[in-house]
């Protein structure tokens, strides 16, 4: 409205018509904006990050700015209303779970008593199978159920604790389990010569296995043991503890083998600290005993694996391939740890045996002891007793193949851990 219209109340017809058309156009634009704007929807991430107004069209999945920029338009997730949900576990269940994750730890200042005295306890980590070895005061034989080992007569070979290990203790440097009573060392009848091992005095005749005087005897004269050493199946109640005891016996027997490398400064009675290729003879290597323990460990591993899977993998024969492709599903990590410890010791022992035999083979002529590695090996009636070089080559091949399979098993066990 101009100056003349304000005082006269008149206006030109042309201007009034233009003003009316402009008002109609603005009203139409406002109506269209209101119908197309969806103000109930939240701003997208792009507009919210740039602190811009987000305008949504009805029936469109993208806002105006994202549509023009051809960008991805994402809406934030709606926030939950109210308080967060309370935990379903009560304090009683939490306290019970914490009590189940504790293990007994032997203290050097406090000894266990008979009148149910409490012992210091340490919490174990469920994700680390070796976390219970963080303290040097851990009573490992009692934790693994090995308080009464060695119990397997086929592996009890004059075992004696090394110097510096007393009572129920565990030496982390040597890894030797020292949980033996004085009566076992004073009574020679409690230790046996393994059945089937080669006798150094007469290789063709295996050493007999004497029966201890304290062993119970049935009516027919057969000795009765709590667990049969050759029967590794067992029932569901005692099989797991029986396997742990046999694995502990194997671990000690492998450590007592002459070819097992000994740490510096540790001297064990009856066990040499090392070998020299110029002084050692083939009769002192005890390779047959090492192969026997390896086969026994493979059978134990397969038996534990088949028990965990309910269905056995094979018939349990000693001639089966026991070292390749092991995939354990052991629920108790202590069993897996002991199995892995045995395989690691076997790897070190076979590596030492292979290096020693190769050095003897490279040295040239053999010694005058004429020890036969395989006295009964024949090919279609022809004996190989006089072919000592061929026998050594065959032993080297066996050690190489066994070492490869043991390392493959160690890799598989590490994957299970």
Curated annotation (Swiss-Prot):
This is C6 finger transcription factor traC. CDD domains: GAL4 (cd00067). It is found in: Nucleus. Residues 104-114 have a biased composition (Polar residues). It comes from the Eukaryota. Keywords: DNA-binding, Metal-binding, Nucleus, Transcription, Transcription regulation, Zinc. C6 finger transcription factor; part of the tra gene cluster that produces terrestric acid. The clavatol biosynthesis cluster cla and the terrestric acid cluster tra are both involved in the production of peniphenones and penilactones. One of its GO terms (cellular component) is nucleus. InterPro entries: Zn2-C6_fun-type_DNA-bd_sf (IPR036864), Zn2Cys6_DnaBD (IPR001138). The keyword RNA-binding does not apply. Residues 80-94 have a biased composition (Basic residues). The keyword Ribonucleoprotein does not apply.
């Amino acid at each position: 409205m101009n100056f003349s219209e304000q005082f006269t109340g008149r206006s030109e017809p042309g201007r009034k018509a233009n003003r009316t058309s402009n008002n109609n156009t603005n009203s139409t634009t406002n109506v269209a904006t209101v119908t197309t704007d969806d103000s109930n929807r939240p701003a997208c991430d792009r507009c919210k990050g740039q602190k811009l107004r987000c305008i949504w069209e009805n029936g469109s999945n993208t806002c105006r700015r994202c549509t023009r920029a051809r960008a991805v338009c994402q809406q934030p997730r709606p926030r939950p209303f109210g308080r967060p949900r309370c935990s379903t576990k009560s304090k009683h269940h939490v306290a019970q779970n914490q009590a189940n994750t504790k293990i007994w730890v032997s203290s050097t200042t406090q000894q266990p008593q008979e009148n149910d005295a409490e012992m210091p306890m340490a919490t174990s980590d469920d994700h680390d199978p070796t976390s219970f070895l963080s303290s040097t005061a851990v009573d490992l034989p009692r934790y693994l159920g090995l308080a009464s080992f060695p119990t397997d007569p086929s592996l009890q070979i004059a075992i004696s604790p090394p110097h510096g290990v007393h009572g129920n203790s565990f030496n982390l440097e040597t890894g030797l389990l020292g949980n033996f009573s004085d009566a076992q060392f004073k009574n020679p009848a409690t230790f046996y010569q393994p059945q089937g091992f080669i006798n150094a005095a007469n290789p063709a005749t295996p050493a007999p296995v004497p029966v201890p005087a304290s062993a119970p005897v049935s009516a027919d004269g057969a000795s009765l043991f709590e667990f049969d050493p050759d029967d590794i199946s067992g029932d569901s109640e005692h099989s797991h503890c029986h396997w742990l005891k046999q694995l502990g016996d194997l671990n000690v027997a492998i450590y007592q083998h002459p070819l097992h490398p000994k740490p510096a400064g540790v001297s064990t009675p009856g066990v040499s600290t090392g070998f020299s290729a110029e002084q050692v003879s083939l009769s002192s290597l005890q390779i047959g005993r090492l192969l026997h323990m390896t086969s026994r460990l493979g059978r134990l591993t397969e038996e534990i694996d088949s028990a965990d899977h309910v269905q056995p993998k094979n018939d349990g024969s000693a001639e089966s391939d026991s070292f390749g492709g092991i995939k354990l599903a052991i629920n108790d990590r202590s069993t897996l740890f002991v199995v892995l410890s045995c395989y690691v010791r076997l790897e070190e022992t076979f590596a030492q045996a292979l290096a020693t035999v190769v050095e003897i083979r490279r040295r040239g002529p053999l010694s005058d002891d004429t020890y036969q590695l395989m006295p009964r090996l024949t090919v279609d009636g022809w004996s190989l007793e006089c072919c000592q070089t061929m026998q050594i080559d065959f032993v080297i091949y066996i050690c190489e193949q066994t070492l490869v399979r043991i390392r493959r098993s160690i890799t598989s066990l590490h994957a299970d851990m």
